[in-house]
Curated annotation (Swiss-Prot):
One annotated GO biological process: iron-sulfur cluster assembly
GO molecular function: folic acid binding
Key words, A-Z: Cytoplasm, Folate-binding, tRNA processing
Superkingdom classification of source: Bacteria
Family note: Belongs to the tRNA-modifying YgfZ family.
Protein name: tRNA-modifying protein YgfZ
GO cellular component, as recorded: cytoplasm
Any Pfam family: GCV_T
NCBIfam families with a match to the protein in the record: PRK09559.1, ygfZ_signature
Main location: cytoplasm
Organism: Salmonella paratyphi B (strain ATCC BAA-1250 / SPB7)
Amino acid sequence: MAFISFPPRHPSSSARLPLTLIALDDWALSTITGVDSEKYIQGQVTADVSQMTEQQHLLAAHCDAKGKMWSTLRLFRERDGFAWIERRSVREAQLTELKKYAVFSKVVIAPDDERVLLGVAGFQARAALANVFSELPNSENQVVRDGASTLLWFEHPAERFLLVTDVATANMLTEKLHGEAELNNSQQWLALDIEAGIPVIDAANSGQFIPQATNLQALGGISFKKGCYTGQEMVARAKFRGANKRALWLLAGKASRVPEAGEDLELQMGENWRRTGAILAATQLDDGQLLVQAVMNNDLEAESVFRVRDDANTLHIVPLPYSLEE
């Protein structure tokens, strides 16, 4: 029996979100297994996976030789290897790049569509899950395994949980929370990631940005002490030579349409508007507010005014829940 996804509804902000069970169809799971899996993935991503415990998950980037990101990966350990979650739109291309050198190593790299990805967020999310699982993750133990399920804990923008589980458990959870929780699709989790300042790399922006342009260094996603990995030289140069002039920003306001990933924005300059930046993700909330995640210059004034191209409405900068000070 397959897992049935949930119908879409406009997402809510984290401050007003009722208990919600979220089908993460726009995200996808992959795995690497085999005796060389740690060594192999360590040579491909920006984070130091050798230091990662069974109780941690990490955000990392997989880059090309020029340090541009194919995608960002949410990595965690599994039985004899690792699993990661990324945007579904980039998975196929990312796996193709990751497999390029796999012939020389004892690894198996594969997509995993057998398991289901679910999010649980909103009012009393922890209490709701405590009725289903014997143990839940927290700030100390960010990853917990319970039977067929792996649960990941997220602090921002408010406590939430990501479940990697089998179809039977996904259906059981849906039944248990039915009537108590709202059901929503990936747009709700996307809205929470945008609020949290977690970079969203879809196909339109794959191969476009170095990790620091999306604040990955502030999210613990780059190790400057580990050994070689693809793109390391460019990523290191951006740090030690100050070559990176961009950052990820959160904007909120109104617009007559929801812009697409890859579009630019317009910045108000006196009487005029100048094109700037690149949108990573955008979504409209149930109160009509538009949230936009964009890569722009890192020296913008906090009072800067933006708009979706040629739109009559405006957007403003919202502080992120972490600091970019190094």
